[in-house]
């Protein structure tokens, strides 16, 4: 088939236009992909910022804002750090932090159409709630005596002069709770639970078997190993400082169940009932006792309503 010159010209023009359109759509697809990637990265950044900010609510709103801004800056959108201002952090209520982030994304090929950049946004809300069940508990249960923050507390009694201790109960307990499996007894398991914490979850209302005896040797071994994991950390009167771990995550911050001091194990009684959960910075031995400092801790676990000093944070938007 032969084409006239004008037909050949028309085909050439059509082919050129088609190629330009295809290239334009391909270019736009690249920019759209860039925008979608940026949106996902920004959302991840504001999520992390909200969670970090909600942890700061344990102290006050100023700390929440500081942590939120700091965490945002540790994230990037298309290799650029996320900039968050204090005016982008708000508080829907006393336990929630809302983050409204935005970021300007430079485009590549859309500049041909006169579009040089787009502004994307992301919103996240996180709340600080009460944890009523968690794992990682140490094998001690102590009487709830209503300590103020920073108070020294006996975590493991060394003799019967401690509150509600007796010749067969020095605050030592076995895991798992009754009804969740057979409680595992013995010195080596008890020692390992001091070092690493329980693998099972302990919740308010659980009934826990008492480990009889003073367990002097296993206690000393376990406490020594645990302190050795973060030996430089210490309590400065307000918080844990000089830790080798990020804030609030030293292994020496231990979680312990509480029981009613008026409902303690008398000689012959083999269980305690968990009425609350709390956390302490492990100091070490003081005389025959093992001591800690009462403090609040953010941890993972089951959220709910109950008598617990453990806090958790989660996204709700």
Give short role names for the model-derived ranges.
Residues 1-70:
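Alpha-helical assembly-interface signal, strongest on the long, hydrophobic N-terminal helix that forms
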Residues 9, 31, 72, 99, ...:
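Residue-level signature of catalytic and energy-coupling elements of molecular machines
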Residues 21, 106, 137-139:
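Proline-rich low-complexity regions
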Residues 108-116:
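Flexible, membrane-facing loop/turn or short amphipathic-helix motifs
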Residues 88-95, 116-317:
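N-linked glycosylation sequons
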Residues 36, 40, 50-108, 130:
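Short amphipathic secondary-structure patches
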